[in-house]
């Protein structure tokens, strides 16, 4: 493990503002919280107005092509701003930059970019900013591989109630469509005591809910001495006084052990919720994806989860249009969605990622077929979600109050233990508290209720 030591000559920046935009998963969100913490630590303040910032940071994603296109669009927009303010420092970091050849491509197309960093060295951004200011030259700094885990980074968290805590980095699964192992590196786990200490510190500051993060949390502990597994870590976190709720993601279906399900059911602070990415309901497609489980394996997992926790909320990811997907394969996916009845599902059209095995496959599904299947799947998912939400009407649920509703600032919002979003009337002094809500109305993607 490596502790961060900030160079003292970077601590001389005052009255400067930074703007950060984040694409991608919760891991990226937590990375941005750390970047924000680092910059605040050297005197910067954060602004939500991009055009008034002295430093603009794009923390990028490359899981799908659409995310990359958005970054290109924003970089193009900043050309005029850079011309207007030559002292503006523009930074691009994250997964997109870790791809082979991408930094050079971005710098060639957008020469007004000042700093390009990858996923392994974003904690060095304060140093890079200082170098640009003193030397005046652009910086491309991409590390080929991880250099251990950096502990002790300052974190500027978005919420005062809930926090992400990363427990491991990287992925060893190499699903055939996925770029993540190539840009996030091999699996490496944090020391359990460092995780416990971080959570205890958060609880002492008033945090009530922790989400344990990893590309595959089920692989946690491999390679540590003494070896520990994720189920054991869950039980350790569950013992922390003052912590109310524990969630985790992402969890690979093939690695969900009976021991983990038992821990989820027995640990009273672990919420009855899990995100288990199905990706396809066709065993043939799952094999091509290198997912290492079958349709029946996934159905068995769901049965085990629901037997152990009858009220468990199960969410998933589904990819439509993987190379070679036939109409039968799609119907297999549609039928398993209807059989399981997920509480929510994130659905995606397959996006070809250069450098992955799937990108070399020739049997690509026509775009119009992809979209037809996608629309049919989304319709089924939404119908199931609306129907399952309807079942909550008249029931009383426990909700952790998170703050004002995003859609109606006259209301408060929070989530049930199973992950359902609930909006209700209340007072701001209830933020951070657990309250009982009677559900009065079910909406397509949320619930409405009243405090009892």
Swiss-Prot record:
Domain TRAM: 390-452
Positions contributing to [4Fe-4S] cluster 1 binding: 25, 61, 95
One Gene Ontology term of the molecular function aspect: 4 iron, 4 sulfur cluster binding
Residue span(s) of domain Radical SAM core: 157-387
Cofactor note: Binds 2 [4Fe-4S] clusters. One cluster is coordinated with 3 cysteines and an exchangeable S-adenosyl-L-methionine.
Swiss-Prot/TrEMBL cofactor(s): [4Fe-4S] cluster
Record keyword Metal-binding present: yes
Pfam families in the cross-refs: Radical_SAM, TRAM, UPF0004
Annotated SMART domains: Elp3 (SM00729)
Source taxon at top rank: Bacteria
Subcellular location: Cytoplasm
Catalytic reaction(s) noted: N(6)-dimethylallyladenosine(37) in tRNA + (sulfur carrier)-SH + AH2 + 2 S-adenosyl-L-methionine = 2-methylsulfanyl-N(6)-dimethylallyladenosine(37) in tRNA + (sulfur carrier)-H + 5'-deoxyadenosine + L-methionine + A + S-adenosyl-L-homocysteine + 2 H(+)
Residue span(s) of domain MTTase N-terminal: 16-134
Residues at which [4Fe-4S] cluster 2 binds: 171, 175, 178
Assigned EC number: 2.8.4.3
Record keywords: 4Fe-4S, Cytoplasm, Iron, Iron-sulfur, Metal-binding, S-adenosyl-L-methionine, Transferase, tRNA processing
GO CC aspect terms: cytosol
Self-association state and partner proteins as the record states: Monomer.
Protein family: Belongs to the methylthiotransferase family. MiaB subfamily.
NCBIfam families: miaB-methiolase, MiaB/RimO family radical SAM methylthiotransferase
The protein's role, per its UniProt record: Catalyzes the methylthiolation of N6-(dimethylallyl)adenosine (i(6)A), leading to the formation of 2-methylthio-N6-(dimethylallyl)adenosine (ms(2)i(6)A) at position 37 in tRNAs that read codons beginning with uridine.
Protein name: tRNA-2-methylthio-N(6)-dimethylallyladenosine synthase
Gene it is expressed from: miaB
